[in-house]
Amino acid sequence: MKLLISLLWSIFFSIVYSEKTLLNFKHYELCNGIYSKSESGGSLNPAIYVNWTEPWGQEDEVEVLIFNWKEIRKLGAFRSDDQFTYICDYDAVYTDHLCEADQLGLYLWNSTSAKSIRSYIIPTNADPQNIIYEISQSGYYCIWSHSKKMLPYQALVNWQNAYGGLPASQFPRMPISGGITIAYSVILALWMFFRFQYKHSIVTVQKAIMFLLIFSCAQQAVTSIVLDTENLRNRGNFTWLGETLVSILFACQLVLDLALLLILSWGYTRYSTNMRDRLFTEAKIPLIICFFALFVVRFFAITIQSIHLGLWFCFFFLTACISALYILFGAFVALPSTLRALVEQRYYTLHSIYKIFRIMVLCGVVTIFSFSLVALIFCSNTNNNSTNKLWKIRWYFLDGWIDGVHLTYLITLSSLWRPSQENPDLDPTGLSYPVLDPRLEEELDLLEEDIRADKSK
């Protein structure tokens, strides 16, 4: 219990730390993407707000530098010994002649050619003036701060986009989540149309697929509602509860996918106690690990405001991918014996479906493995140079692709097992059930003992 509490506390601390909305003498650099009004639309004026919170009254000056990362090369200068510096110090003034004496302790930057760079010098011996930096062009903006006397200071930074309060890293999720909800609704409507036509011959697999379609449609609808609420209102208790609910539904959805895929690969097309026992015996632990890891991955991805998610996200993402690949590999290994059993018992319609199903499982293994490598590269890379180019699509390569894989998976299953006149051929009885029947195993053991006894005589 203590270990679990420590783990949960570490996760919470990582989330709070990764938010990085406080600017102070320890975290003197903040970077984030922000959209312009012309690109994202909306009624608000996009801007970066820096509101000072630390008590003042000390003799000091704090310089705040805000700029678009594209102009990073216009900051700093080389010394005479080829060392690069961003701050005007005594050597920069009297030895290298890079700045004037009245610029001591300030940032070095090219004020003649810079377009987005703004410098704000805040005296701390009085009530400091809050900073408003207006955004006219979408980009990856950074805030650098520096105290001349290295005294403590603190400010709260708000990255205000024109469309609302949703962070720029989460903005693409909102329309795409709504689009996926519509896609699930269309698939579900078509499925219900075929189901109504052949309602008297619906088999168990088709009922499971219909449940997954309804569950996925509801999950995406809840995600859209939570994101829209967070965009219209400030973050509060409802937002945290909504993000937790979205993460739980997301993890449940994918665990149900993996469980159904594994059950079908074993050849079970209807519920039985043998199927349940086999699932609990062979896949219970991987499914539980996958559920917890997927919950944390989605919760981190939609909760953390910063572009950089941290090492905890990488750890849980890797755990989720490994457990999912383990289950998929087990399904792929079990499929050849299922295909042979289908041929032996002359279930040719189901055999043709399972051949396509095997290709789908193999494609799932390759897709998850490939996207996992790309996501880990994105997650572990905290270089601002690369983030500046990829901050708009970074969300997709981290965890957004999982929704696309799930949508493709459900479309394929719905197409293969769609209700039709061949419904009875899609649910053979006795295909794999006797394999793990304990009574049959006892009879086989007794038969083997009798054979050994006869041979010994």
UniProtKB/Swiss-Prot annotation:
Signal peptide from the UniProt entry: 1-18
Residue stretches spanning the membrane: 174-194, 208-228, 244-264, 285-305, 315-335, 359-379
GO biological process, one term: cell surface receptor signaling pathway
Membrane-topology annotation of the record: Multi-pass membrane protein
Positions on the Cytoplasmic side per record topology: 195-207, 265-284, 336-358
Keyword Endoplasmic reticulum recorded: yes
GO cellular component assignments: cytosol; endoplasmic reticulum; endoplasmic reticulum membrane; Golgi apparatus; membrane; plasma membrane
Official protein name in the record: Uncharacterized membrane protein C18A7.02c
Family: Belongs to the LU7TM family.
Ranges per topology, Lumenal: 19-173, 229-243, 306-314, 380-457
Organismal lineage: Eukaryota, Fungi, Dikarya, Ascomycota, Taphrinomycotina
Entry keyword annotation includes Transferase: no
GO MF annotation terms: signaling receptor activity
Intrachain disulfide bonds: none
Keywords: Endoplasmic reticulum, Membrane, Receptor, Signal, Transmembrane, Transmembrane helix
Protein's cellular compartments: Endoplasmic reticulum membrane
Native organism: Schizosaccharomyces pombe (strain 972 / ATCC 24843)
InterPro entries hit by this protein: GOST_TM, GPR107/GPR108-like, PTM1-like_N
